[in-house]
A protein has these predicted regions:
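Catalytic cores of alpha/beta
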Residues: 144-152, 195-209
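Active-site entrance/lid segments in N-terminal catalytic domains of soluble metabolic enzymes
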Residues: 2-189
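Single conserved hydrophobic/aromatic residue that forms the stacking wall/gate
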Residues: 215-224
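Glycine-rich beta-strand-to-loop/alpha-helix junction loops that act as flexible
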Residues: 190-194, 213
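Extended hydrophobic/Leu-rich segments
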Residues: 71-75, 208, 215
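Active-site-proximal beta-strands of protease catalytic cores
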Residues: 157, 207-212
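Hydrophobic alpha-helical segments that mediate membrane insertion or helix-helix packing
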Residues: 37, 202-203, 211-214
Length: 224
Protein backbone atom coordinates (compact mmCIF):
# COMPACT_ATOMS: atom_id res chain seq x y z
CA UNK A 1 0.00 0.00 0.00
CA UNK A 2 1.28 3.46 -0.91
CA UNK A 3 0.92 5.65 2.17
CA UNK A 4 2.52 8.69 0.58
CA UNK A 5 0.50 11.67 -0.65
CA UNK A 6 2.92 12.78 -3.36
CA UNK A 7 2.66 11.31 -6.82
CA UNK A 8 6.38 11.63 -7.57
CA UNK A 9 8.20 11.03 -4.30
CA UNK A 10 11.98 10.61 -4.87
CA UNK A 11 13.36 7.16 -4.12
CA UNK A 12 15.79 8.64 -1.59
CA UNK A 13 12.82 9.48 0.64
CA UNK A 14 11.27 6.01 0.45
CA UNK A 15 14.34 3.85 0.99
CA UNK A 16 14.21 3.82 4.79
CA UNK A 17 12.23 1.60 7.14
CA UNK A 18 10.07 4.48 8.33
CA UNK A 19 8.98 7.76 6.68
CA UNK A 20 11.11 9.77 9.10
CA UNK A 21 13.87 12.34 8.75
CA UNK A 22 15.73 12.84 12.01
CA UNK A 23 15.87 16.61 12.38
CA UNK A 24 19.26 18.38 12.31
CA UNK A 25 19.85 19.69 15.83
CA UNK A 26 22.34 22.41 16.74
CA UNK A 27 25.39 20.91 18.52
CA UNK A 28 23.63 17.59 19.21
CA UNK A 29 23.58 16.11 15.69
CA UNK A 30 27.06 14.67 15.11
CA UNK A 31 28.38 11.78 12.99
CA UNK A 32 27.82 9.10 15.66
CA UNK A 33 24.15 10.01 15.94
CA UNK A 34 23.61 10.41 12.19
CA UNK A 35 25.20 7.04 11.44
CA UNK A 36 23.10 5.32 14.11
CA UNK A 37 19.93 6.91 12.75
CA UNK A 38 20.69 5.84 9.18
CA UNK A 39 21.54 2.28 10.23
CA UNK A 40 18.24 2.15 12.12
CA UNK A 41 16.41 2.97 8.90
CA UNK A 42 15.59 6.68 9.15
CA UNK A 43 17.29 9.56 7.36
CA UNK A 44 19.85 11.04 9.74
CA UNK A 45 20.89 14.67 9.40
CA UNK A 46 23.13 17.35 10.84
CA UNK A 47 23.68 21.09 10.36
CA UNK A 48 26.84 21.80 8.37
CA UNK A 49 27.76 24.44 10.95
CA UNK A 50 27.91 21.77 13.66
CA UNK A 51 31.24 20.74 12.12
CA UNK A 52 33.21 23.42 13.92
CA UNK A 53 36.75 24.15 12.94
CA UNK A 54 40.00 25.12 14.58
CA UNK A 55 42.65 27.16 12.86
CA UNK A 56 45.36 25.06 11.27
CA UNK A 57 43.37 21.82 11.39
CA UNK A 58 41.71 19.94 8.48
CA UNK A 59 38.24 21.05 7.41
CA UNK A 60 35.92 19.37 9.88
CA UNK A 61 32.92 19.13 7.54
CA UNK A 62 35.01 17.18 5.06
CA UNK A 63 36.06 14.76 7.81
CA UNK A 64 32.46 14.30 8.92
CA UNK A 65 31.18 13.58 5.42
CA UNK A 66 34.04 11.19 4.71
CA UNK A 67 33.34 9.22 7.88
CA UNK A 68 29.56 9.10 7.42
CA UNK A 69 29.81 8.13 3.74
CA UNK A 70 32.44 5.44 4.27
CA UNK A 71 30.75 3.92 7.32
CA UNK A 72 27.35 3.73 5.64
CA UNK A 73 28.92 2.27 2.49
CA UNK A 74 30.65 -0.37 4.59
CA UNK A 75 27.42 -1.17 6.41
CA UNK A 76 25.56 -1.58 3.12
CA UNK A 77 28.24 -3.90 1.72
CA UNK A 78 28.10 -6.06 4.84
CA UNK A 79 24.30 -5.96 5.12
CA UNK A 80 22.83 -6.08 1.60
CA UNK A 81 19.45 -7.18 3.00
CA UNK A 82 19.38 -4.40 5.60
CA UNK A 83 20.79 -1.25 3.97
CA UNK A 84 21.08 2.03 5.80
CA UNK A 85 18.86 4.98 5.00
CA UNK A 86 20.56 7.97 3.30
CA UNK A 87 21.73 11.02 5.23
CA UNK A 88 21.06 14.74 4.95
CA UNK A 89 22.98 17.96 5.59
CA UNK A 90 21.29 21.15 6.72
CA UNK A 91 22.61 24.36 5.19
CA UNK A 92 21.80 27.74 6.74
CA UNK A 93 21.32 29.72 3.55
CA UNK A 94 21.14 33.15 5.21
CA UNK A 95 23.77 35.55 3.88
CA UNK A 96 25.23 35.91 7.36
CA UNK A 97 26.70 32.39 7.01
CA UNK A 98 30.30 32.99 5.87
CA UNK A 99 30.94 29.29 5.20
CA UNK A 100 27.97 28.65 2.94
CA UNK A 101 29.59 28.56 -0.50
CA UNK A 102 32.61 26.57 0.69
CA UNK A 103 30.41 24.09 2.55
CA UNK A 104 28.26 23.69 -0.56
CA UNK A 105 31.33 22.75 -2.60
CA UNK A 106 32.26 20.12 -0.02
CA UNK A 107 28.74 18.66 -0.02
CA UNK A 108 28.82 18.43 -3.81
CA UNK A 109 32.20 16.70 -3.64
CA UNK A 110 30.77 14.05 -1.29
CA UNK A 111 27.50 13.65 -3.22
CA UNK A 112 25.25 14.47 -0.28
CA UNK A 113 21.90 12.86 -1.21
CA UNK A 114 19.52 15.09 0.77
CA UNK A 115 19.98 18.82 1.41
CA UNK A 116 17.85 20.62 4.00
CA UNK A 117 17.94 24.39 3.50
CA UNK A 118 16.86 26.99 6.04
CA UNK A 119 16.53 30.77 6.41
CA UNK A 120 16.52 31.70 2.76
CA UNK A 121 15.75 30.18 -0.64
CA UNK A 122 18.54 30.61 -3.18
CA UNK A 123 18.53 29.05 -6.66
CA UNK A 124 22.32 28.58 -6.73
CA UNK A 125 22.16 26.33 -3.66
CA UNK A 126 19.44 24.19 -5.25
CA UNK A 127 21.43 23.98 -8.48
CA UNK A 128 24.52 22.82 -6.58
CA UNK A 129 22.53 20.05 -4.88
CA UNK A 130 21.08 18.91 -8.19
CA UNK A 131 24.53 18.86 -9.78
CA UNK A 132 25.53 15.92 -7.58
CA UNK A 133 22.19 14.12 -7.75
CA UNK A 134 20.86 15.47 -4.47
CA UNK A 135 17.39 16.72 -3.62
CA UNK A 136 16.55 19.88 -1.68
CA UNK A 137 13.99 20.06 1.12
CA UNK A 138 13.37 23.62 2.28
CA UNK A 139 12.17 24.64 5.75
CA UNK A 140 9.08 26.84 5.61
CA UNK A 141 6.68 28.22 8.23
CA UNK A 142 3.81 29.39 6.01
CA UNK A 143 2.29 29.01 2.57
CA UNK A 144 3.91 32.18 1.20
CA UNK A 145 7.42 30.93 1.93
CA UNK A 146 6.45 27.52 0.57
CA UNK A 147 5.57 28.99 -2.82
CA UNK A 148 8.78 31.03 -2.93
CA UNK A 149 10.91 27.96 -2.15
CA UNK A 150 9.40 25.89 -4.96
CA UNK A 151 9.62 28.80 -7.40
CA UNK A 152 13.35 29.03 -6.67
CA UNK A 153 13.99 25.35 -7.34
CA UNK A 154 13.53 23.39 -4.13
CA UNK A 155 12.30 19.83 -4.66
CA UNK A 156 10.28 19.54 -1.49
CA UNK A 157 9.16 21.32 1.64
CA UNK A 158 9.47 20.81 5.38
CA UNK A 159 6.44 22.41 7.01
CA UNK A 160 7.76 23.62 10.36
CA UNK A 161 4.52 23.99 12.31
CA UNK A 162 3.67 25.04 15.85
CA UNK A 163 5.41 22.83 18.39
CA UNK A 164 8.56 22.27 16.34
CA UNK A 165 11.99 23.05 17.67
CA UNK A 166 14.40 25.59 16.22
CA UNK A 167 12.88 28.16 13.87
CA UNK A 168 9.32 27.02 14.50
CA UNK A 169 6.29 28.56 12.88
CA UNK A 170 3.05 29.62 14.58
CA UNK A 171 0.59 27.69 12.41
CA UNK A 172 -1.30 24.55 13.27
CA UNK A 173 0.00 21.57 11.28
CA UNK A 174 -3.58 20.87 10.15
CA UNK A 175 -3.92 24.30 8.57
CA UNK A 176 -0.40 24.45 7.13
CA UNK A 177 -0.47 21.03 5.46
CA UNK A 178 -3.96 21.67 4.06
CA UNK A 179 -2.93 25.02 2.54
CA UNK A 180 0.17 23.62 0.89
CA UNK A 181 -1.54 20.49 -0.44
CA UNK A 182 -4.06 22.65 -2.31
CA UNK A 183 -1.37 23.42 -4.89
CA UNK A 184 1.77 21.35 -4.19
CA UNK A 185 1.90 17.63 -5.01
CA UNK A 186 5.62 17.11 -4.38
CA UNK A 187 7.54 15.90 -1.32
CA UNK A 188 6.09 17.40 1.87
CA UNK A 189 7.45 16.75 5.35
CA UNK A 190 5.86 17.85 8.62
CA UNK A 191 7.65 18.94 11.77
CA UNK A 192 6.13 19.88 15.11
CA UNK A 193 5.36 17.85 18.27
CA UNK A 194 5.72 14.51 16.48
CA UNK A 195 7.06 11.92 18.90
CA UNK A 196 4.87 8.81 18.65
CA UNK A 197 3.68 6.35 16.07
CA UNK A 198 0.17 7.78 16.38
CA UNK A 199 1.47 11.27 15.56
CA UNK A 200 3.41 9.87 12.59
CA UNK A 201 0.33 8.11 11.23
CA UNK A 202 -1.82 11.22 11.75
CA UNK A 203 0.72 13.29 9.82
CA UNK A 204 0.57 10.91 6.87
CA UNK A 205 -3.23 10.92 6.91
CA UNK A 206 -3.21 14.75 6.83
CA UNK A 207 -1.18 14.73 3.64
CA UNK A 208 2.47 14.71 4.68
CA UNK A 209 4.78 12.18 3.03
CA UNK A 210 7.32 12.05 5.82
CA UNK A 211 7.87 13.60 9.23
CA UNK A 212 10.87 15.29 10.79
CA UNK A 213 11.70 14.64 14.42
CA UNK A 214 14.63 13.59 16.58
CA UNK A 215 13.64 13.64 20.23
CA UNK A 216 13.23 9.87 20.57
CA UNK A 217 16.77 9.31 19.29
CA UNK A 218 18.43 11.64 21.80
CA UNK A 219 18.67 9.35 24.86
CA UNK A 220 21.05 7.04 22.99
CA UNK A 221 24.66 6.33 23.83
CA UNK A 222 25.83 7.70 20.50
CA UNK A 223 24.52 11.19 21.28
CA UNK A 224 26.09 11.51 24.73
Amino acid sequence: MNIHSSTNLPAVLTSGKLPVVAAPLFIISVPDLVIAQCKAGVIGSFPALNAREKEGEPIELERWLKRITEELDRHNQENPDNPAAPFAVNQIVHRSNPRLMRDIEICVKWNVPVWITSLGARPEVNEAAHSCGGIVLHDIINNTFARKAIEKGADGLIAVAAGAGGHAGPQSPFALIQEIREWFKGPLLLSGSIATGRALLASLMMGADTVSYTHLTLPTICSV
